[in-house]
Amino acid sequence: MVKKSKFWLPMIGIASAFALIPAVIVSCSRNNSTISQQYITTDIGGLNNTFNPTNTTGDNVNHKLVEKVKEIRQGGDQAKKDLLDQRVILITAGGKTNDKSFNQSVWEAVSKFSNEIGASDNTYYENSVIDQSTQSNSYDYAIAKKFKVWILTGFQQENFLIQWLSVGNNLKRFLNNKTFVITVDWFPADKSKIPAIQTILDSIKGRILGLNFKTQHGGFTMGYAASKLVQEIDADLKQDIPPNKWGTQERAFESGQTYFDAFGGGDFSGVTNFNYGFYEGLRQFNEENMNSSQQQNGKYFIKASPTDLTTNFAINNESKQKVFAQVDGHFVNGTQIPPKLIFPVAGSLTSVAIDRVKEKKSNQWIVGVDTDQSLAFEADKGILLTSVEKRIAIAAYKALLTVFGLTDYDTANQSEEKTNLLHGSGNTISDGLIMNGGSPVNFNSTGGYKEGFVGVSKSTLDPNLFKFKNKNKTYAERFDEIVAETWDKFFGKGDEEGLLQKKKNDNGGLFDENLFNQFNSATDRWSGYRNNAKTDPTKEQIDDVKPHILNLKNPFYGYMTFDDKWIYFDPIIDYINNFK
């Protein structure tokens, strides 16, 4: 039996110059870590994060919040003053804080919030090495320096934090410190089948607010919009091609059928949510633009290449060969056809895909993930169609407003309902704990397009290379227009419902989110068994997960590839079916 393990997605470290504000700055190094209070005014995350402490009248300052904080500090309510004085620390799990991506987005949120409430000593603790010892040192430092609000990025921190809490008197220290944790892109999974771990999680109930992202929304919009763009390019090219002798025209674009390709670093929802939405976008486009006979015969306008979920994020010879295979394309009737679009959900392997496209000079398009990757790949942005974004900075800023009890004072979002991440959940924050009906609870705030948690970046395709022949417009300009149209059509404009909410197709809606969430719950429980045990799941654990996954197989990834196979969560399903 092949041993499987859950691999993590390392952040892409890109050196950039921080824009510093006049403040007390402390920076030091500890072995593989850097500790700093250098606030930044960059705007990777779309927060309009510019701030001058000597001028609080700028357009991007949350004036209502600044005035409220001043009122609290001058007033007599000590409890509110104490709340404002909670110190925040960002602890990373790999990568630099100035990565022009994930970590930097979070630190932008902390910087903006800190500046607006007048906090000068909030801190980041970045770790260049991902292991238990390094992360434990981070948590020890946070306790020793009395940081009460911890922001932990990187899903691998779930296991690091639980392991640290299980050692010595760390749990007692954590509780005595009145620690509150904001988890970014992860949330502790149910560990009821592992009692020792569940006991620890029960001990810290009320102290965890998770930030997670419905990346399937962005994947859907990107997939649908890219398909429509190809359709319009084809129509544009056809204007210069006369009909054949039968009086018809074949497809002009790419000399025939077009293929899109996605690959991933692992078989868990942090990866496959992107894929799921992407394939649903392709499926929806094809269903709208093809008759039933064409669909039954697999003559889709856009087809998908097989999806490899085993690239494992790390750059090495094996993973490079897998990426090369995806970029180079698959054989159809003896002819190798490269995909027009490549969607890597595999961390640093995006750079490998970009380099391969450049080497082949193939004019293929790359789609990034997590943040606007054109900022990290400035020199190569001309082949980036877009990025499916987690709006991490916006989510983190809202989380801080929620934890500090300041959600009424976010002028950017205008309403408490849009800012308070606990709104509508029945939960409140009282004395530093999330409470529901008098009991402490941890809460996972999972947002999609409507909540401002996900998006699709502006296209940066080279305007000289990629433009329409018969109309004065670049592919990038038209793609951005289609994206806006797609959001409105499927997700709704303003308070209107979109088609995804109206559930108009036969199998319960373009997104049956309830079914989708059940599947993710099962697969993540499966992934948790593997990761926590550091070995293959037991027969009992397989039996626990198997019915959930197999029962949900048919509705998941309902999209046919060019070789007439349906895309499912094959690595898990194959493993379960072949389990001995």
Indicate residue ranges for each PLM-predicted region.
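A residue-level marker of the well-folded mature domains of exported/periplasmic proteins
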Residues: 46, 51-53, 57-580
